[in-house]
Amino acid sequence: MATSLGSNTYNRQNWEDADFPILCQTCLGENPYIRVTKEKYGKECKICARPFTVFRWCPGVRMRFKKTEVCQTCSKLKNVCQTCLLDLEYGLPIQVRDAGLSFKDDMPKSDVNKEYYTQNMEREISNSDGTRPVGMLGKATSTSDMLLKLARTTPYYKRNRPHICSFWVKGECKRGEECPYRHEKPTDPDDPLADQNIKDRYYGINDPVADKLLKRASTMPRLDPPEDKTITTLYVGGLGDTITETDLRNHFYQFGEIRTITVVQRQQCAFIQFATRQAAEVAAEKSFNKLIVNGRRLNVKWGRSQAARGKEKEKDGTTDSGIKLEPVPGLPGALPPPPAAEEEASANYFNLPPSGPPAVVNIALPPPPGIAPPPPPGFGPHMFHPMGPPPPFMRAPGPIHYPSQDPQRMGAHAGKHSSP
């Protein structure tokens, strides 16, 4: 191999020889059986410019081949993947991680200072067990709530897709389905995410992906406690099939005494009731948007009383099973409430457009026998009685839905009406 003509020394003792790369789960791909090629001193590290061992592999079917971009020394200094340069623990850019940990690692950028700094860090790495990062990152022991909220716990394999075919964009690709590149519309060149630099990603400056995540963190929603002080129940959603009641109890017992834990396997959720309101508030604050159990991110919300949920369902047109129904199209609006006795003459009960004077005049007739006598004189004709408030068992006027839209009602009472 032809050595570099840069300012670095040509001493082979500074070159790196490794047996296996340092990669994240996303870059490795979803296939557990992959073939990796190894090339000693195949390229220069894009950070320290030293020759290192390059690994190349295909992460999956119809994915592009990937290779290591930086040496293992630079990877261990920042605790990042050798290919995507994202943090191995949180899956976030270095700029976001450093902002969450509230520290700034000023690494030298000149050639001579970088070489001296790298040699000192290699000596420190050789004296450690290799399981923890070195330098400033190794001294940061505290975790951040922002990092737990933004952490990527599951791999994102779409990042390994091929690049966009430039010939297809120009309308000249003749490979069709056999083309190894994507036939999709490219992103807007004015989009800041379209211009990314690997050195900016490593040093944590001017990273557009990090800027986007930091803006998202500043606008994250908050979980405010309900006004009803009697509510001490938390809703935990997204349990899946692997999380049990014991796993939830092991996490939430630290916040206070737990009264009951109800797991609903059908809805993959659970309701955790605490003995005191203070314990429930602490659990909600410590677990909202950052609860991860068995590698699965869970959704934590405050529980609601049955009366409040019933009112919201009637207002939103939601069934007991949680299905939102669409209102029946083509129906007129709700009728106005009955007017007072003095407003009956000008009331419009059927939402009809205004018209001229009526052609027919109502003539008061004597009541038939058996009917109550007319009101005494001076009170006017007794045509309509003012209506009071509806009984409590009647629903307020609102959107009307077809009964067939509710799957819980279809055939629910068929067995009751059938003859034995």
From Swiss-Prot:
Zn-finger region bounds: C3H1-type: 159-186
PROSITE patterns: RRM, ZF_C3H1
Cited Pfam families: RRM_1, STL11_N
Biased composition (Basic and acidic residues): 309-318
Keyword Oxidoreductase assigned: no
InterPro entries found in the cross-reference section: Cwc2/Slt11 (IPR039171), Nucleotide-bd_a/b_plait_sf (IPR012677), RBD_domain_sf (IPR035979), RRM_dom (IPR000504), STL11/RBM22-like_N (IPR048995), Znf_CCCH (IPR000571), Znf_CCCH_sf (IPR036855)
Positions bearing Phosphoserine: S4, S102
Modified residues (N-acetylalanine): A2
GO terms for cellular component: cytoplasm; nucleus; Prp19 complex; U2-type catalytic step 1 spliceosome; U2-type catalytic step 2 spliceosome
Major place of residence: nucleus
Keywords: Acetylation, Cytoplasm, Isopeptide bond, Metal-binding, mRNA processing, mRNA splicing, Nucleus, Phosphoprotein, RNA-binding, Spliceosome, Transport, Ubl conjugation, Zinc, Zinc-finger
Annotated crosslink Glycyl lysine isopeptide (Lys-Gly) (interchain with G-Cter in SUMO2) location: K139, K149, K290
Superkingdom of origin organism: Eukaryota
Subcellular locations according to the entry: Nucleus; Cytoplasm
N6-acetyllysine: modified positions: K212
Disordered: annotated span: 303-343, 372-420
GO biological process, one term: positive regulation of protein export from nucleus
Domain RRM: 232-305
Recorded GO MF terms: pre-mRNA binding; U6 snRNA binding; zinc ion binding
CDD domains attached to this UniProt entry: RRM_RBM22
Domain comment in the entry: The C-terminal RRM domain and the zinc finger motif are necessary for RNA-binding.
Subunit composition and interactions: Component of the pre-catalytic and catalytic spliceosome complexes. Component of the postcatalytic spliceosome P complex. Interacts with PDCD6; the interaction induces translocation of PDCD6 in the cytoplasm. Interacts with PPIL1.
Family label: Belongs to the SLT11 family.
Job of this protein: Required for pre-mRNA splicing as component of the activated spliceosome. Involved in the first step of pre-mRNA splicing. Binds directly to the internal stem-loop (ISL) domain of the U6 snRNA and to the pre-mRNA intron near the 5' splice site during the activation and catalytic phases of the spliceosome cycle. Involved in both translocations of the nuclear SLU7 to the cytoplasm and the cytosolic calcium-binding protein PDCD6 to the nucleus upon cellular stress responses.
The name this protein goes by in its record: Pre-mRNA-splicing factor RBM22
